[in-house]
């Protein structure tokens, strides 16, 4: 399984991420061709070799050729990506990043998610950075992403909302649940886009996972800090963990006094925050009270973040957790062509093909046909790998 490790020793930004992926093998021309699937223009892409403190890296720059670019709301960006010609997995990754970013902006500005109005992020260059990251991860075949802690930074930064403290409020919101590293000096080290990429896609934090490195990419930021090279280091490698074996935590609590309608929202919040699986099962508690057992399977690094969600989004006043190991069948995520269009599917090593729910749901809504019919069509036409 291909894994990527983001070593954010100097921070992370959207352009640094795309630059590192280019250095790892994403051709700039492929990036241009894939981005052509988005319904907007008025920009050019440039990538070049640079040096930061004597270390060679790659920079990535988006230059606007049309000055009059509209600001965009989150709802419009989400619809634009969904209606584009991008691959299903690229759409899914980009949507996860944008939604995480929109949630942070909504929390900071106190507005509903649908009304979030992006300024810097709504600009073409930031849309390119986020979608470009999704394109790069898909092109390189990355199936799991891990990251180091993030530097907090200090000082002030100029934004569309005026002069704000570092990290910007949206960045600070996105950093919740992510380990922070020691102070490395003045300046903005993590941008909202960079924080959103890590918050939305990282499967765990800390040192690199067991892996055999296949390549290293250095993505250079625009600024040149005096303390250390302004580079994002991304390691691409093959996982060396026992095939299909993974250390996890099981988080549990029993709930007997909550409106059942809230359970669905609780599950959504946990899955969006990185839970590997969430399940509800009925049980009888003392005095024969009917209740629900919430079980969350999680990466050990996500314990604090997921526990906080359980305690804030439910009536639970406590929970328990314990380590466990799980074994999963080796699988890859692929895009298959069907009579209904491109569909994302999981392909197991046995050859069995399983349709991806989000991809099938999108087709069902677009074509106005029952979801079960989409599943049957995909299973019939894709069959065995």
UniProtKB/Swiss-Prot annotation:
Gene3D superfamilies membership: mk0293 like domain, Transcriptional regulatory protein pf0864 domain like
A Pfam family: Ni_insertion
Highest taxon, organism lineage: Bacteria
Alphabetical list of InterPro entries matching this protein: Ni_insertion
Keywords: Nickel
MF (Gene Ontology): lyase activity; nickel cation binding
PANTHER family attached to this UniProt entry: NICKEL INSERTION PROTEIN-RELATED (PTHR36566), PYRIDINIUM-3,5-BISTHIOCARBOXYLIC ACID MONONUCLEOTIDE NICKEL INSERTION PROTEIN (PTHR36566:SF1)
Record family assignment: Belongs to the LarC family.
Protein name in the entry: Putative nickel insertion protein
Species for this entry: Citrifermentans bemidjiense (strain ATCC BAA-1014 / DSM 16622 / JCM 12645 / Bem) (Geobacter bemidjiensis)
Taxonomic lineage from the root: Bacteria, Pseudomonadati, Thermodesulfobacteriota, Desulfuromonadia, Geobacterales
């Amino acid at each position: 399984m291909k894994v990527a490790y983001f070593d954010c020793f100097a921070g992370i930004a959207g352009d640094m991420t795309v630059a590192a992926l280019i250095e790892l093998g994403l051709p700039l021309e492929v990036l241009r061709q894939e981005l052509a699937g988005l319904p907007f223009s008025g920009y050019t892409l440039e990538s070049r070799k640079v040096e930061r403190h004597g270390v060679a890296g790659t920079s990535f720059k988006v230059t606007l050729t049309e000055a009059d670019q509209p600001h965009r709301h989150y709802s419009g960006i989400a619809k634009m990506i969904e209606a584009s010609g991008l691959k299903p997995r690229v759409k899914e990754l980009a949507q996860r990043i944008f939604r995480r970013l929109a949630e942070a902006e909504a929390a900071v500005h106190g507005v509903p998610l649908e009304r979030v109005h992006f300024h810097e992020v709504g600009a073409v260059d930031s849309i390119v950075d986020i979608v470009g990251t999704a394109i790069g991860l898909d092109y390189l075949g990355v199936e799991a992403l891990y990251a180091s802690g993030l530097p907090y930074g200090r000082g002030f930064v100029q934004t569309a909302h005026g002069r704000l403290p570092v990290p910007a409020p949206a960045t600070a919101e996105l950093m919740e649940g992510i380990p922070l590293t020691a102070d490395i000096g003045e300046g903005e080290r993590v941008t909202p886009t960079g924080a959103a990429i890590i918050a939305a896609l990282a499967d765990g934090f800390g040192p690199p996972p067991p892996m055999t490195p296949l390549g290293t990419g250095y993505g250079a930021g625009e600024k040149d800090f005096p303390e250390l090279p302004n580079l994002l280091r991304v390691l691409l490698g093959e996982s060396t963990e026992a095939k299909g074996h993974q250390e996890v935590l099981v988080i549990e609590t029993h709930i007997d006094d909550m409106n059942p309608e809230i359970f669905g929202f609780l599950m959504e919040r946990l899955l969006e925050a990185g839970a590997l699986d969430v399940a509800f099962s009925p049980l009888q508690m003392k005095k024969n009270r009917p209740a629900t057992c919430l079980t969350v399977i999680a990466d050990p690094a996500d314990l604090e973040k997921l526990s906080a969600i359980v305690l804030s989004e439910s009536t639970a006043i406590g929970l328990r957790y314990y380590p466990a190991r799980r074994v999963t069948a080796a699988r890859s995520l692929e895009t298959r062509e069907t009579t209904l269009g491109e569909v994302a599917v999981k392909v197991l090593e046995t050859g069995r093909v399983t349709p991806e729910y989000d991809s099938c749901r999108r087709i069902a809504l677009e074509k106005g046909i029952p979801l079960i019919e989409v599943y049957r069509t995909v299973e019939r036409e894709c069959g065995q790998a």
